[in-house]
Amino acid sequence: MTEVFTIKQCLDGEISIDETVTVRGWVKTRRDSKAGLSFISLHDGSCFSPIQIVATDQLSNYHKEVTKLTAGCSMIATGKLVASQGKGQFFEIQAESIEVVGWVENPDTYPIQAKRHTLEFLREVAHLRPRTNTISAVTRVRHSLAQAIHRFYHEQGFFWVHTPIITASDCEGAGEMFRVSTLDLLNIPKNDKGQIDFSKDFFGRETFLTVSGQLNVEAYCMAMSKVYTFGPTFRAENSNTSRHLAEFWMIEPEIAFANLEDICKLSQSMLRYLCKTVLEERADDMDFFNQFVAPGCIERMEHIADSEFEIMTYTDAVKALEASDQKFEFPVSWGLDLQSEHERYLAEVLCKKPVIVTNYPQEIKGFYMRLNDDGKTVAAMDVLAPGIGEIIGGSQREERLEILDRRMDECNLNKEHYQWYRDLRRYGTVPHAGFGLGFERLISYVTGVSNVRDVIPFPRTPGHADY
């Protein structure tokens, strides 16, 4: 039996010319010549480019099946791998047999025709959109970035911790969470005060889908020293923007005996590593994005890979923004959060490279961030990248119980819900720090695909959970 190869193996020159190979995949296009030849463009997802299958009318099923192949049909082809006579390709397969595995019913109504489709349309056929050039390229880049993240942290001595999806804690303190419940909605139990009695629920208390793995991974940081979590998180924000998803993935490292400077260095090393990796491993896909989606994205990745990031305090950033001649839509003032236009000005105009802004006012940051000695700012950091603005957010955590309790009171958080988190400060507390990187935000930045709904397989947004 002839060995089965991927199209990537065939096109990468791993196989000798004139060797008989078998490939499997889906038809992109088919064109016929008057000389009794059919040229079939076949893809299998292993690389960006399809391979051309040349079929002659000498095949036993040529007239009955081969000439009826349309976009989306699945097939298995066996034949000799030869140097291609056509332009734009180095190799093709001279078919000795073609087996049609699956036909497309009603080819005229098949959604993924051989033409360019808008990303908005493709979201309506999310189960078929991986067959397009853009989404398949995004998927391969996503894979390479995910593998690179695990490799980077493994090489740095980190342990991957699988934090829970179901939680009783709100890391962000924002309250925009998805509730998890098995209570009968038609017969909800009530307590003496007329409130929902969550003691009758599955977990015996109110529970939610996690908004972040940070609090849980901090617990393992206090025993394993260097850990990270990489998994799905959920936000019940009713936001219909190109930057928001209800379900998305986060990378969250946490380091014991560490301060703000340590995570600034780690974030820079990680981003540089990821940019280098994607340029090396996904050159064909990045060429596509650079040519058709976001011209200049390769140069942008090269720039980040080779740059030393600028570091400035929030106070200095505000002063620089106030001193600029730029007219901003949103006001700039100490104590207000930086908006995307401010972040991009700092990275693109002022510094012309990635910027790490540190030491933000405590009022605009999370309760768990370490209060600085000035009593006004916390040891927080945001990494701002040219072309997108904030891409990473992190901080040194508050390891002093009395100050953590005070911050929780100021944020009106119920300490009973965070008792285990407070225990970490009571039993062998140490300075520690970490950050979060939204995975879809990273993929969007790398590929230039501007809407995060197009860089996750099945996007979850307000009013949309169809697949």
From Swiss-Prot:
Query: What are its E.C. numbers?
Result: 6.1.1.22
What is this protein called in UniProt? Asparagine--tRNA ligase
Q: Which gene encodes it?
A: asnS
Cysteine-cysteine disulfides: none
Where, per UniProt, does this protein localize?
Cytoplasm
> Cellular component terms, GO, for this chain's entry?
cytoplasm
Q: Which organism is it from?
A: Legionella pneumophila (strain Paris)
Q: CDD domains from the entry? A: AsxRS_core, EcAsnRS_like_N
Q: Which GO terms describe its molecular function?
A: asparagine-tRNA ligase activity; ATP binding; nucleic acid binding
Give the family from UniProt.
Answer: Belongs to the class-II aminoacyl-tRNA synthetase family.
The Gene Ontology biological process terms listed for this entry are: asparaginyl-tRNA aminoacylation
> Known catalysed reaction(s)?
tRNA(Asn) + L-asparagine + ATP = L-asparaginyl-tRNA(Asn) + AMP + diphosphate + H(+)
